[in-house]
Amino acid sequence: MAAKDVVFGGEARARMVEGVNILANAVKVTLGPKGRNVVLERSFGAPTVTKDGVSVAKEIELKDKLQNMGAQLVKEVASKTSDNAGDGTTTATVLAQAIVREGFKYVAAGINPMDLKRGIDKAVTALVEELKKASKPTTTSKEIAQVGSISANSDETIGKLIADAMDKVGKEGVITVEDGKSLDSELDVVEGMQFDRGYLSPYFINNPEKQSALLDNPFVLLFDKKISNIRDLLPTLEQVAKAGRPLLIIAEEVEGEALATLVVNTIRGILKVVAVKAPGFGDRRKAMLEDIAILTGGKVIAEEVGLTLEKVTLADLGQAKRIEVGKENTIIIDGSGAAADIEARVKQVRVQIEEATSDYDREKLQERVAKLAGGVAVIKVGAATEVEMKEKKARVEDALHATRAAVEEGVVAGGGVALLRAKQAVGDKVKGDNADQDAGIKLVLKAIEAPLREIVNNAGGEASVVVNAVLAGKGNYGFNAANDTYGDMLELGILDPTKVTRTALQNAASVASLLLTTEAMVADAPKEEAGAGGGMPDMGGMGGMGGMGM
C-alpha cells in the first residue's frame, strides 16, 4: 500500500479552501447576464466554449491532492444541483464558496465547527421556508419564456422556443433537444410517445455517441408474455428480415436463448433488432401496450384474443417512422396508427380520468393522455459553427430544465433578490441554542448576498452599493445587471424557479458544512522522483574545462 500524507486542523482546511476557491473562481465568472465564457481544452478537436457552471466544474482536477479534495466536494454541489433542478449550478457554487469562506474565519477564531454546522442548518431551513412563501406559480406562456431566457443566459429566442414547445405538447409533454441543420434554432413537433423502459442489452446500441439505439422505419412487435424460446420468434424474424426493416420487440421480458440470439444477429448485422420490456405493471401494462398498438397501428399479440407468436404476420405488427431506445427510455416517433383510432382512445382514457377515485390513478391516466395526444417537441438548435452549436445546445438544455422546475414549484424574483428578501424575512427570528450556533446563522445570512454580489461584479459594478440599494427596497425590487437599472424583477421578467434557488442553497450549505467540520485529511504522499540510474558520478570535474587553452 502506498504511503499516505495525513494533514490536520487549520492546515488541512486552508489547503481545502484553496481548492474550493480555484474551482469556484473559475465557475463564478459565468454568472449573470454579463457573465463571461470559459474555454475548455479538448484532447482532440476544437476547444469547448461554455457559460454553463457545471460543465466548467466537471473539467477541473487539481495537481495538489488536498486542494483537489476541496475542489471535488464543491464540484459535487454543482452536479447535485444540476441533477435535482437542472440549473442553478453557478449559484450553488458561489453560495458554497461564500459559506466556506465565512465559516473558515469563525473556525479559525475557535468557534465549535459542529455547532456552526447546526446553526447553518437552522438558517437554511428558515430561508427555504421563506422562499416557498415568496414563490408564485407560473401560469402564462410569457412567464415560462422569461424563465427559459434567464436560464439560457438572457437569450430570449431560446426562452420563446421552450414556451412554444410547452404550449404545443403541454406541460407533461416530452421535449428533446437536437442539432439543427440551419443557422437559426427551430421547433419541430412530432407525434410520438415516450415510456420509461430502455434496451435489455447494451449490445443493441447503434449510436455510441448518444448511447442509444436508433431504428428508422421499424416494425413493432407487442407481446404480453415472456419470450425465452427463439423458435417462437423465428417466423416473425424471417418475415421482417425479408422486408429489410428493423424491428422493436416490446414484451413482458425477453430472456435467455431468445435475447442471446437477437444480440448475436444484431452484432453480425444480419437483422437490426432491439428488445425492451413493456412499460407499467399488471393491468396498467396491458393498457399501455394497447396504447402503443393503437399509436403504431399494430395489435397486441395475446393468447386471450387468439393470437400467438407463431401465427404473427406483418399486418399484426405496428410501424413507426423512427424509434429511439436509450438506457432508460424509449421514444416512438410518428406511429402509423389511424388518427381517428388515437382520438377515440384519448376520449376513452379521459372518461376514465373523470371516474378515477385516487390521485395516483388520475395522474397515471393523465400521463397516458399526454403520451397519446401530446407528441414529442424537438428543439433543433442552429448555429454558425459546431463549437457555438455545442455551447448553445447546453444552454437550451439548461433552460428546459429550469422551465420544468418553474412549472413544478413556481418562481421567485431572480438576480439574487429572492435570497436577500428571504434573509430580511428571517432577520432575527431564528435563534441558535448557543452563541456558536448563532454564529452559523449569522454566517449564512451574510453568505446569501454572494450571488447578487457576483452578478454585479461580472457586470463591472460596485457590489456593496447595489446590495445596500436592493436591501433598502421592498418586495421584488432588484438590480437588472443587463442594463444597470433597478426595478421590479417580476415585471422586468427576471425570474428564477423556486426549486432551482432552493436546491442551490440546500446543496451549497450541505457540502460547505462538511468542509467546515473537517479536522484531518488523508491523501497519497507525492512519489519521490528517483535519481539517474546506475549511480553515475557527478560531472563536477567538467567545470575545469576553462583551462584547456582553447
From Swiss-Prot:
Domain of life: Bacteria
Annotated Pfam families: Cpn60_TCP1 (PF00118)
UniProt-recorded name of the protein: Chaperonin GroEL
Keyword Oxidoreductase: no
A molecular function GO annotation: isomerase activity
Family of this protein: Belongs to the chaperonin (HSP60) family.
Self-association and partners: Forms a cylinder of 14 subunits composed of two heptameric rings stacked back-to-back. Interacts with the co-chaperonin GroES.
Lineage: Bacteria, Pseudomonadati, Pseudomonadota, Betaproteobacteria, Burkholderiales
Organism, as annotated: Variovorax paradoxus (strain S110)
Main subcellular location: cytoplasm
Primary gene name: groEL
